[in-house]
Structures are given as C-alpha cells and as structure tokens.
Amino acid sequence: SITDIVSEKDIDAALESVKAAGSFNYKIFFQKVGLAGKSAADAKKVFEILDRDKSGFIEQDELGLFLQNFRASARVLSDAETSAFLKAGDSDGDGKIGVEEFQALVKA
C-alpha cells in the first residue's frame, strides 16, 4: 500500500495543501508527501498503485483520481488540474504517463 512508501503524517500534510479546488501543484504535493526524495524504485511502486487498470501507463482518468490513491476521502482533481498534471508528465506527447515519465515528474 502507499503507506509502505510514504507516511500518514506526510499524506495528511500533502492533502491539506491541495484541499481547495484548483490548488493542486504536483511539485509541492510530491515534496510534501515525501516522494520527491525517494528512490526511482519507490517512485515505480507508487506508479504501479496509480496505474489502476495495470496498462503500464497512467491515463487521464486515473490522474483525476490521483489524490484518492493517498486517501479514499480525498477530492477528485478538476479537469484543468488533471490536464496540467498530464501535460507536465507526458514528455513524449502520447497522452499518458509512463513509468519513466512518472519517475522524472516526481524528481522535477
């Protein structure tokens, strides 16, 4: 589970920082949740949790549910937040985020 990789306390802080609609910033979130300093292997484990359909990619609908992977009661990202997140992570322009792209995004 995600709490094997990041702490409940850090999840609380990260979710608190994005509670307001439109406030999601992936760089701040990854820093607050403690992922920015984790290894590529840990980032890959988180990627595998986010990739709900196990396609090997995080698609736009999965990105919308991003916060709920950290806590089921968290809000859904808005379309604008989801699009910006996808654009930031999709370096090859295929409309989805692969594992290497996610690892780079976490470190950004």
Swiss-Prot record:
Ca(2+) 1 binds at D51, D53, S55, F57, E59, E62. The modification N-acetylserine is found at S1. GO terms for molecular function: calcium ion binding. The keyword Transcription regulation does not apply. GO terms for cellular component: cytoplasm. Keywords: Acetylation, Calcium, Metal-binding, Muscle protein, Repeat. SUPFAM superfamilies: EF-hand (SSF47473). The keyword Calcium applies. Ca(2+) 2 binds at D90, D92, D94, K96, E101. PANTHER family: PARVALBUMIN ALPHA, PARVALBUMIN, THYMIC. This parvalbumin has an isoelectric point of 4.5. In muscle, parvalbumin is thought to be involved in relaxation after contraction. It binds two calcium ions. This is Parvalbumin beta. It comes from Pelophylax lessonae.
